A protein has these predicted regions:
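Basic, polar low-complexity surface loops/patches
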Residues: 1-253, 298, 305
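Extended C-terminal regions of large enzymes
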Residues: 56, 77, 154-157, 161-164, ...
Length: 454
């Protein structure tokens, strides 16, 4: 038998309808499609018909890692989630990535990925423990936020367990629902949290004690060490060199096996402005334009705990609502006035900050689909524009959502002129786009291709 390096050799398949657990051979695909994204795209081609929608039981929720996952290679903690994505407008095959530690743990448990199909009769979660797999009842965690879900599953299975889960937004099939892992990382784009919810799948908990076999360990280790020395050098990115940036209450952190210190944790020991409980962690990927710093932090916590795509709310839904107010389509939600600037909104920076109370109300309504506004916005602005205000808000999407694809532009200027990636820096990305497996919406290489797609 040929020795396998990098891979474990098995992809887990869980049929929730039939309560059947099987595996398929990774190497059937790996030699031709290289990594988890390519393998999942091939499986989607074989198994997902054009008639399958995002919430159909026959949609596949594929969670994949690659041959480097679980090794010392920088960035090898990443995991990709793929399937027909409800956030896309219209729904189509897409993917979203997340960091953290869940991906390597899946590899250590003996699997190169998971294919989930069907729909459970009642809420369940999947428990993976060193190759042993069970489908267990989630009745006690259904309805919980993502943080409480992780805490509960760790109390059951042990503190060394890694968890991904959907929050109330996913359970309520919000098209902008995320899959959250622990406190700092999420598969934020695509709406895959709602795909979990549609399958009555609350979470996947995993623990593994295995390893990853490397063909030439010494050479590989030398390369990893060389890379680690180059990262923190004076010529490397500043984020790789600086750890603490604001004293004892804030600390930069990183995912497993990664040199980039791009996440942050904020410790707080004081009561929040409008939240009754205390919390410990701030998500640093996106920023809400809020009138107070504490409100901004609490909003990030709420979005992650509800399992909502905070990027979509901050950079898409709220600017669209402010544009709608400027065009006299709406003035308030539940008696709370929608803030909007006096001057026309041309760029994201022109938007008015919102109060913490307004944002907390909006996130709650989205997560639980409360009222006509909450129910519509739970699907994102592109879908909401078709339902609200007689469709008169659809033209206002043009500046925020390229081609109304369902996801707000990412990174390159956050819609409109003023992006910081220009010629010729995006040429390599254009070539990558030509052979990619997904749509050209947000976060396809940070949307640098948006400069040519128009």
């Amino acid at each position: 038998m040929t020795e396998i390096y990098g891979w474990t050799g098995k992809i887990l398949r869980v049929d929730l309808t039939r309560k059947k657990i099987t595996t398929i051979d990774t190497m059937k695909y790996a030699r031709m499609y290289i990594g988890g994204v390519g393998i999942a795209a091939r499986i989607a081609w074989e198994e997902i018909g054009p008639e399958v929608g995002p919430f159909d039981p026959e949609n596949r929720l594929m969670i994949m890692v690659g041959p480097l996952t679980g090794t010392l290679a920088s960035g090898s903690c990443r995991v990709e989630v793929l399937g027909v994505a409800p956030q896309q407008h219209p729904p189509r095959f897409s993917r979203s990535g997340m960091g953290g530690h869940w991906g390597p743990e899946l590899k250590y448990a003996g699997f190169d990925g998971i294919i989930i199909q069907g729909r459970a009769e009642k809420p369940v979660y999947i428990w993976i423990d060193d190759g042993d797999v069970e489908i267990l009842s989630a009745k006690d965690i259904w309805g919980l936020g993502t943080y409480a879900t992780t805490k509960t599953l760790r109390s059951i299975h042990g503190d060394d367990v890694r968890v991904i889960s959907c929050g109330p937004a996913g359970e309520n099939l919000c098209r902008i629902a995320i899959i959250q892992t622990e406190t700092e990382n999420a598969a934020g784009q695509g709406g895959f949290g709602a795909v979990m919810g549609s399958k009555n799948l609350k979470a996947i908990a995993v623990r593994g004690s295995g390893g990853v076999k490397v063909a030439r360990p010494k050479e590989f280790l030398d390369l990893c060490l060389k890379q680690s020395r180059e990262g923190p050098s004076p010529y490397g990115p500043k984020s790789l060199r600086e750890m603490d940036i604001s004293g004892p209450n804030f600390r930069r952190r990183k995912c497993g096996f990664c040199l980039s210190i791009c996440s942050g944790m904020l410790w707080m020991d004081v009561q929040g402005e409008f939240l009754p409980a205390l919390y410990t962690t701030e998500q640093m990927c996106y920023g809400f334009n809020v009138t107070s710093e504490r409100g901004k932090i609490e909003a990030r916590f709420l979005a992650s705990n509800y399992g909502i795509n905070g990027w979509e709310v901050s950079y898409g839904i709220i600017p669209w609502l402010q544009l709608c107010k400027q065009h006299d389509l709406i003035k308030e939600i539940d008696g709370m006035e929608i803030p909007a600037p006096d001057k026309p909104i041309r760029y994201l920076r022109d938007c008015a900050p919102v109060t913490p109370e307004f944002l907390a109300m909006l996130l709650h309504k989205i997560a639980y689909r409360e009222g006509p506004i909450g129910d519509a916005l739970a699907d994102g602005a592109c879908y909401a524009a078709e339902r609200l205000f007689g469709g008169r808000g659809k033209p206002l999407l043009d500046r925020i959502y390229p081609r109304h694809a369902g996801q707000v532009e990412h990174w390159a200027g956050h819609w409109g002129p003023g992006g910081n990636i220009y010629w010729p820096m995006w040429l390599t990305t254009v070539l990558q786009w030509c052979v990619d497996t997904r749509d050209p919406a947000s976060d396809t290489s940070h949307s640098w291709t948006s400069h040519v797609q128009r």
